[in-house]
């Protein structure tokens, strides 16, 4: 008798991706974050769907519809806070996933890595548009400031901004189209994640040693399904601790005030997961230069496969590169802190130094460290 999971056209796809998939025997907990990101996406789509049933994308009623969800809908407060904090959880997992990819040299799988960068851009776009929807003060002013950055594009900038706004300022048309895009993008993310997996399974997973593991593979199920399940339980425990005990820990108090175009908040800043990029944007006095630096802060990841000089893939046995990696992590945390501070001394110069260090580590110091380590090993 043939096994159904190996013959049925649909089951066969699932089998090859999650059951009989040959997986390196030595991958660590850092490889859990792919499946955890899948869980985050499911949480976001499910909670978002229920929120969309009660939300109205209109400048007059958007804020009160969110209040209505929290007060009058059964467990509406829970769904709303799950969705808001789910975004933070998504980005925590995303940044850890990218960090693991850099540390263990997973960027050598160029197609998988590039699709991952596209996924990061899509997720950032979705999160930004979602932040606008409650129509609080920070929603409105965040949307105004960030969309206005496009006006830095020479010649067509102003027309482009007004086209995106659907008028001469952020208004009803903007809110409506942002809601439409915010609804459709997670499904595009899900489809792109499938392509990400497709490319990954063409090459197989990397491992902590960064060496080929074809001679030592084990089936994904039961070894890694149980490991992923444990990761999911721990993640959900952390998630619900935040949602149920500290739901507003990661949000901005200004967003509890309805949007008012006549009253600018003292400090306009995005959600915490964009602060590092926002700090890089602000560290350059020129508008167009700042926008280019902002985009490059993410796009620089696409250069990693092309500027690797070391003959070892992983950083596991490369102490100089390890030091630079953790310096980069500290630098990103410093940028995140600076992004939330007002634009005044000493924060301006700290932000500029941290921004310069960010690009210097990735583009100059890491490749030089790779060459030095090759020489030390007489390679």
From Swiss-Prot:
Subcellular location: Mitochondrion inner membrane
Swiss-Prot/TrEMBL cofactor(s): heme b
Record keyword Membrane present: yes
Membrane topology: Multi-pass membrane protein
Pfam family, one: Cytochrom_B_C
Main location: mitochondrion
GO molecular function: metal ion binding; ubiquinol-cytochrome-c reductase activity
Note: Heme 1 (or BL or b562) is low-potential and absorbs at about 562 nm, and heme 2 (or BH or b566) is high-potential and absorbs at about 566 nm.
Cited function: Component of the ubiquinol-cytochrome c reductase complex (complex III or cytochrome b-c1 complex) that is part of the mitochondrial respiratory chain. The b-c1 complex mediates electron transfer from ubiquinol to cytochrome c. Contributes to the generation of a proton gradient across the mitochondrial membrane that is then used for ATP synthesis.
Protein name: Cytochrome b
């Amino acid at each position: 008798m043939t096994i159904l999971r190996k013959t049925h056209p649909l089951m066969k796809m699932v089998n090859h991706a999650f059951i009989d998939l040959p997986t390196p025997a030595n991958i660590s907990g850092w490889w859990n974050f792919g499946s955890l990101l899948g869980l985050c996406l499911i949480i976001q789509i499910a909670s978002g769907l229920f929120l969309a049933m009660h939300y109205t994308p209109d400048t007059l009623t958007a804020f009160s519809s969110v209040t209505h969800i929290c007060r009058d809908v059964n467990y509406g407060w829970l769904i709303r806070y799950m969705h808001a904090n789910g975004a933070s959880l998504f980005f925590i997992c995303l940044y850890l996933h990218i960090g693991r990819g850099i540390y263990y040299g997973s960027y050598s799988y160029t197609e998988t890595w590039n699709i991952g960068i596209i996924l990061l851009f899509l997720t950032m776009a979705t999160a930004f548009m979602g932040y606008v929807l409650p129509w609080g003060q920070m929603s409105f002013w965040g949307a105004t400031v960030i969309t206005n950055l496009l006006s830095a594009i020479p010649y067509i900038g102003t027309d482009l901004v007004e086209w995106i706004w659907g008028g001469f300022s952020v208004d009803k048309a903007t809110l409506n189209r942002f809601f439409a895009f915010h609804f459709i993008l997670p499904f595009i993310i899900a489809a792109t994640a499938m392509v990400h997996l497709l490319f990954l399974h063409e090459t197989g997973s990397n491992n902590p040693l960064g060496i080929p593991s074809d001679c030592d593979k084990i089936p994904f199920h039961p070894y890694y399904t149980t490991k992923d399940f444990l990761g999911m339980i721990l993640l959900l425990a952390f998630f619900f601790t935040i949602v149920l005990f500290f739901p507003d820990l990661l949000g901005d108090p200004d967003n509890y005030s309805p949007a008012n175009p006549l009253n600018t908040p003292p400090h306009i800043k995005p959600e915490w997961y964009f602060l590092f990029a926002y700090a890089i944007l602000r560290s350059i006095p020129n508008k167009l230069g700042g926008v280019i630096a902002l985009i490059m802060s993410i796009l620089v990841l696409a250069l990693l496969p092309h500027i690797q000089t070391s003959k070892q893939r992983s950083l596991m046995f490369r102490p100089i590169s390890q030091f630079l990696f953790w310096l980069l992590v500290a630098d990103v945390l410093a940028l995140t802190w600076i992004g939330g501070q007002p634009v005044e001394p000493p924060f301006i110069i700290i932000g500029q130094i941290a921004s310069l260090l960010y690009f210097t580590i990735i583009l100059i110091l890491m490749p030089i460290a790779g060459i030095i380590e090759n020489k030390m090993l007489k390679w």
